[in-house]
Regions:
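Structural signature of tandem alpha-helical TPR/SEL1-like repeats
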Residues: 17-29, 51-63, 86-96, 121-126
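TPR/TPR-like (Sel1-like) alpha-helical repeat modules
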Residues: 83-106, 112-119
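Mid-chain, well-packed structural core segment of small domains
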Residues: 60-89
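Short coil turns that delineate tetratricopeptide repeat
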Residues: 35, 69, 102-103
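TPR-adjacent "capping" and linker segments in tetratricopeptide-repeat scaffold/adaptor proteins
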Residues: 1-6, 126-128
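Canonical tetratricopeptide repeat
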Residues: 9, 43, 77, 110-111
């Protein structure tokens, strides 16, 4: 039997020591055994985000949003993940929800930055051939 708590502990240790890729290996195994455990999935998403495995982070965060659409922290992480992929228009709804849920001025500032990037992207001239 797999000890999910031990895998989670090791994953957190690796992440805390600056090795998010190493953490992701333990946390992915924990997630295989506990695919709806929000703590495991959040730690896995953070490990993927910190190691720039943004597609993987997005998939895990989407699962977390499906599990609890009202989790402001998950919405914030998903918005940041999408923004980091220059998908600011996709990030904006998640960041707005995070701001509404958390009422955190820093999150509201992220909304403003994402909105500005969306506006800038829409106004940018098309690339020359």
């Amino acid at each position: 039997m797999t000890d999910i708590g031990e895998l989670l502990r090791k994953g957190r240790l690796f992440r805390a020591s600056g090795d998010p890729s190493g953490a992701a290996r333990y946390l992915a195994e924990a997630a295989e055994h506990a695919p709806r455990d929000r703590t495991v999935l959040t730690e896995l998403a953070l490990a993927h985000f910190q190691s720039a495995a943004l597609g993987k982070a997005e998939r895990v965060l989407t699962t977390l949003v499906d599990l609890d659409p009202s989790d402001g922290y998950t919405r914030l992480l998903l918005g940041r993940t999408l923004s980091r992929q220059s998908r600011h228009a996709d990030a904006l709804p998640h960041l707005r929800l995070a701001a509404a849920i958390t009422r955190d001025p820093e999150v509201e500032a992220e909304v403003a930055r994402a909105r500005a990037r969306v506006t800038t992207t829409r106004e940018a001239p098309p690339p020359s051939p």
